[in-house]
Every structure is written in C-alpha cells, then in structure tokens.
C-alpha cells in the first residue's frame, strides 16, 4: 500500500510511517517531504510538520509563497488547538454568544464540563437565528453541530485564528480542493456583513480530531461525543445543522454559504 492509498482510506498513522520511510529514501525530493508535512499536520504533529517544511528546497518560483501559506496555516492551527488564547472575532466587537463560547472551551480544557454546559447554554440563549442559502438551497436556522462553535464559523487568515459569528457573515465561498491539506483547511473567500472581504482558509476538521481514529483525523467521518456530561463535541469532519430540522450537511461538501 502506498502512503496516498493509506491516507485515502483514513489510515493516517500508516500513511505517516510510509511517507517518513519515503522521505528517508529521498530526502531531497520536495514533493515527498511536502506530503509528509501535510500528513503530520493532520496528525497534529505541528512542530514536526514545521521542521520538515523548513527543509524543503524547491526550484519552483512559486514555492516561497506556498511555503509562507503553509507556515501560516500551521501557526493558525497551533493557536486554535494548543494556545490558550481567545480567537479574534470578525468583525468586532464580539457578540455576547461568541464571548460566552470561549469560556466554555476554557472550562473543558480545565476539566470543568458542568461549567462548560452553563456557558454554552448561556450562549445559545442569546444566539440569533439566521437564514440564507447553502449552495442555493434556502434555510432558516444554521449552526455547527459542535456546541463549542455552534454560532460561529472558524476561519484562518494571515496566520491568525478567528471566529465569524454567523449573523455577521454574508458569504463564504469554499474553493475546490487541490491538494491533500485542502481536506483540512479549504481556501475560501469570506465576505462580512460590514462589506469587508478577505481570503483565508476554513478548517474542515474539528480541533483535537488527530487524537481519534484515522478516519476522523482526516475528516472522512464525524462523531458526536459527550464523554463527561459536558457540551456536545465533535471529532472528524466539520458538520453543519441546517434548517428547522437540523439537517446534517458536511462543511466539506458546501461550496457557498450566504446569510441574509
């Protein structure tokens, strides 16, 4: 089995081991080392990914810009998954529901699930309902399946980790996936209610999914978990609940979300 085949089947640990062997055999092959960088990012091994990224020497004139983009993605993911920092909220100031979700995440990290439930319940109580279109299909009601992020869209831009409250989003256009890492961080164009627009990446896999089975780590499947009577959390691919019935729509399958 090749590393690409193992990755496609969600066998992430096997794919990493196979690709590490390939890089050991061909240490000067930039494509081989870049694929290892991508696999290590899925596996949550951000430091190792950054180390291998620095070792890539490519004659491609576009490589410096590509390397800079990879570094920014790794930096944003570190801030999302490992740094104890409140995300940027766009546009500011943060609405009450967004301000209450961050303490819930902090409470979960500190082992206080009951406090986390209180925070997410308080956030839900002041979250406005939004309506709009997902790929042209109208909806009334939109939320993330994970209580930690129920009312916000996670976005990476310029190495920063941000939340966009759904009521402050006007449109997000997810571009087609061109490489393996696009399955985790999809290039996107974001338009805010203020009229401001920017290019960034939308994470398609929940933070911490690298600790689960391979199919979840690479976003092929999603599972909702509540191991400690805390808020509902998800592992695997990002999942939206759309409309009054809460229809499950994988974010990776969306091309455009518009909010009225």
Per-region residue spans from a language model:
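Structural register within alpha-helical repeat arrays
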Residues: 2, 35-36, 71, 103
């Amino acid at each position: 089995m090749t590393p690409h085949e193992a990755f496609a089947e969600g066998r992430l640990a096997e794919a990493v081991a196979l690709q590490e062997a390939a890089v050991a055999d061909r240490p000067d092959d930039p494509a081989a080392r870049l694929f290892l960088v991508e696999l290590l990012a899925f596996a949550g091994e951000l430091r190792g990914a950054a180390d291998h990224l620095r070792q890539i020497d490519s004659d491609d004139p576009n490589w410096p810009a590509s390397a800079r983009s990879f570094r920014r993605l790794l930096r944003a993911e570190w801030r999302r998954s490992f740094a104890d920092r409140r995300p940027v909220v766009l546009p500011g100031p943060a609405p009450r529901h967004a301000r209450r979700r961050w303490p819930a995440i902090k409470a979960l990290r500190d082992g206080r699930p009951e406090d986390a439930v209180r925070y997410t319940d308080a956030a839900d109580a002041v979250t406005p309902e939004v309506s709009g279109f997902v790929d042209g299909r109208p909806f009334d009601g939109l939320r993330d399946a994970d209580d930690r992020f129920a009312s916000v869209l996670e976005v990476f831009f310029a190495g920063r980790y941000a939340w966009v409250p759904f009521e402050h989003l006007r449109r997000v256009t997810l571009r087609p996936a061109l490489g393996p890492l696009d399955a985790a961080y999809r290039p996107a164009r974001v338009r805010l209610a203020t009229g401001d627009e920017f290019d960034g990446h939308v994470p398609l896999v929940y933070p911490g999914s690298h600790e689960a089975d391979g199919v979840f780590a690479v976003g092929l499947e999603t599972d909702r978990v509540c191991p400690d009577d805390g808020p509902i959390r998800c592992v695997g691919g990002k999942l939206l609940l759309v409309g009054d019935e809460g229809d499950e729509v994988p974010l990776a399958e969306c091309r455009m979300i518009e909010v009225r």
